[in-house]
Amino acid sequence: MGSKNNRQPATTAITAGRDDSGSLAPSLTPATTWSSSGLEESHRQAKAIHETKFYSRYANPTVEAFEHAIAELENTQAALAFASGMGAISSVVLALCSKGDHIVAQRNCYAGTLAFLNGPCARLGIEVTFVDGRNAQEFGSAVRPGKTMLVMAESPSNPHLDLVDLSALGAIKGPITVVDSTLATPLGQRPHDYGVSIVLHSATKGLAGHNDATIGVIAGDQELIGEIWGYSILHGATASPFDAMNALRGVRTLDARL
């Protein structure tokens, strides 16, 4: 679903996610279903992780091109797109947390994230401790060994623009660390380079950038992204190929816009 690269992010933004057709513009594949060679092949596809040409809730070539581009930009092994930024946030939390688990989260965060952590998470028995993200030590101090599954931060935060010490966050051992890097974009920072487990974007905003795509995306190591993908096909917050095409077009202009 992606590969690490050593190119400058601005160059990657222009070239990442291109297919083999030679087209400079993102290609659109609106298909929802693909044929197979037989029943055995269908069974194999249904069990495969992120099978591109099976069923669009599992994967889609246009969406996959966008995912490849984000993985390259974030310098991670893989990426996974969702129907929105909140689709990404809720899928990460619900894929990795169960009743009785604990989350440490930044207090000054996006209103939708705050509502999700205070609402559905509480109803599902997932406890959340909120900390001041401007003091990175508070994240580590709030971790409960063996119980805290996620440490969640935004940098810069929306809308207060609070910054988080990414090195300190990446150094936390035990829980999976998540940084919403929407307002920075990969051209401003790459949290995974500091040891953060998952980088998250509401790509509707800076990445897509043209007000014509609603889409979210996460990036991280292959195994972790694959685990979240397994939940995402049940959660159903699948990215549209039309939005992925527009978002990938937006990524091409990212450096010029910033």
Question: What residue spans do the PLM features occupy?
Answer:
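Conserved N-terminal alpha-helix of the aminotransferase class I/II PLP-enzyme fold
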Residues: 36-87, 112-119
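Conserved PLP-enzyme active-site core in the AAT-like
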Residues: 2-4, 10-19, 78-258
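N-terminal glycine-rich, Lys/His-bearing helix-loop that initiates the first secondary-structure elements
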Residues: 1-50
